[in-house]
A protein has these predicted regions:
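Hydrophobic alpha-helical transmembrane segments
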Residues: 95-110
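Hydrophobic alpha-helical transmembrane segments of multipass integral membrane proteins
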Residues: 78-88, 106-117
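Non-transmembrane, membrane-adjacent beta-strand/coil modules in membrane-associated proteins
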Residues: 139-208
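N-terminal membrane-targeting/pre-transmembrane regions
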Residues: 2-97, 202-206, 219
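Conserved beta-hairpin
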Residues: 111-159
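Cytosol-/stroma-facing membrane-proximal "stalk/adaptor" domains immediately downstream
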Residues: 200-234
């Protein structure tokens, strides 16, 4: 009779059963690995960007860009980062900061600029992909969801301008937005397992996402036979 209350009390105190504690530790370990993976994928994206190539777009598929909507915001962030780097260096020199400190701060700021460039490159080189096998929905290096053709019942146009967050799960709906917008919806026949950016798993039956040219994306879905489509708005 006391086992259940004791277990609840243990959870409140940060404990729990040994199995639960091991599971929690494993989840904590997933986050650093995924963060390192994001950085590695971003650096690969920089290399692809320089070579004007894209990641994961076979000849039989159609790339569906989404970088256009967020390009100005990301470039502005990059410019601010560069200005901050220069301003901090000038300030540290003016107050006579020792060279090792200046070099350390400069290195950290330069790495921040590199990461900002990597995110921009990942957004450009990792578009959504629509092909005969299905639909691949991505958000830079942070999310990569493959939707098999057999699960897709409908792709339709929508106009949502008030989405919250770039990547979010609301019930059984996955939302992948750009500057708070989505304009395409994919409906599924059954729940699809989705791994969120920091490793948490969700099961979704609807996906809302953004494309720079949603009409072209819908046409690609129709011509590739990737889905049963409808152009109705939602």
């Amino acid at each position: 009779m006391t086992a259940r209350p004791d277990r609840a009390a243990a959870r409140r105190n940060g404990g729990g059963t040994p199995v639960e504690q091991v599971g929690a530790l494993r989840r904590l370990g997933v986050v650093p690995r995924r963060l390192v993976g994001f950085e590695a994928a971003g650096l690969v994206s920089l290399w692809l960007w320089v070579r004007r190539r894209r990641h994961g777009v076979p000849e039989s598929a159609t790339a569906v860009p989404y970088a256009g909507a967020v390009a100005s915001t990301m470039v502005m962030f990059l410019v601010v980062s560069v200005v901050e780097l220069v301003a901090v260096e000038i300030l540290l020199r003016a107050v006579g900061a020792p060279a090792p400190l200046r070099h350390a701060i400069l290195l950290i700021d330069a790495y921040g600029v590199l990461i900002a460039l990597a995110v921009i490159a990942a957004t450009v080189t990792r578009p959504h992909v629509i092909g005969p096998d299905g639909i691949r929905i991505r958000s830079a290096a942070f999310l990569d969801v493959r939707v098999p053709r057999r699960l897709v019942t409908e792709v339709r146009l929508v106009r949502n301008y008030n989405e919250q967050g770039t990547i979010r799960v609301d019930g059984d709906v996955l939302i992948v937005s750009a500057i708070a917008q989505t304009n395409l919806v994919v409906e599924l026949t059954e729940p699809l397992r989705v791994v969120r950016p920091l490793g948490r798993v969700a099961y979704v039956r609807t996906i809302r996402f953004f494309a720079d040219d949603p009409a072209a994306a819908l046409a690609a879905a129709t011509s590739s036979g990737a889905a049963v489509t409808s152009s109705g708005s939602g």
